[in-house]
């Protein structure tokens, strides 16, 4: 009887472990982070929540990472349980507050717990660049990429749009990187963390021709060598990208945009 009860307890414990979300905790804690409330990152593999994991790894701040490995629906169910109105990744529990929007979360963590790291000083000439790219990443770049993706998946393009398109927004980044090593200016910053996701989307989904943007490619190569990003991938993307969108069969032809009617 006792043996059977022990066996049942062991099986129950194994079942609980199998069903539980994967939890990872940062191995290092930066001195002075004691005032930070507990941070739990609710994550979907290969999505924007990776930015917050990367940020915490760069800063050496403690966090818990919650997702169901290889199960996007299961991970989303965990997010929906704590954020039912706008379930999205990242959803971050910061003490007793629920936070969304990766850019806002990055700014909050850097302002309160970054100790001056990953962000130019207020009087730095690099601060305007940093702020532009922090917001350009989602406000212009990602927005245009996904808009073009939906349109081009429905009807593959024959000519470039007369409006700002995916090639134009990536070219803006390419031109900036011709004169600056990082999107925050002289040093790696939160702006670089913001920009990696949409620039990977641009090439992975065949929205642009990667060969046209050597400065972006060189920047990506530097980024991929960062130890904090490697740790992030080990923890937050252990099996590689899952559930990704299909690549476009073709993108708009490169070159000048078509003229606007009447111009």
Regions found by a protein language model. Name each.
Residues 3, 22-37:
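C-terminal segment of N-terminal export signals and the immediately downstream linker at the start
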Residues 133-225:
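GST-like fold's C-terminal all-alpha helical module
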Residues 31-160, 262:
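GST-like domain detector, emphasizing the conserved glutathione-binding G-site
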Residues 236-263:
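Acidic/histidine-enriched, glycine/proline-rich intrinsically disordered or flexible terminal extensions
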Residues 69-72, 191, 237:
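Conserved beta-strand edge residues that scaffold enzyme active sites
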Residues 7-8, 76, 127, 163, ...:
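Short, structured helix-loop boundary elements
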Residues 1-17:
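N-terminal secretory signal peptides and thylakoid transit peptides that target proteins
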Residues 226, 231-232:
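A late-sequence structural motif
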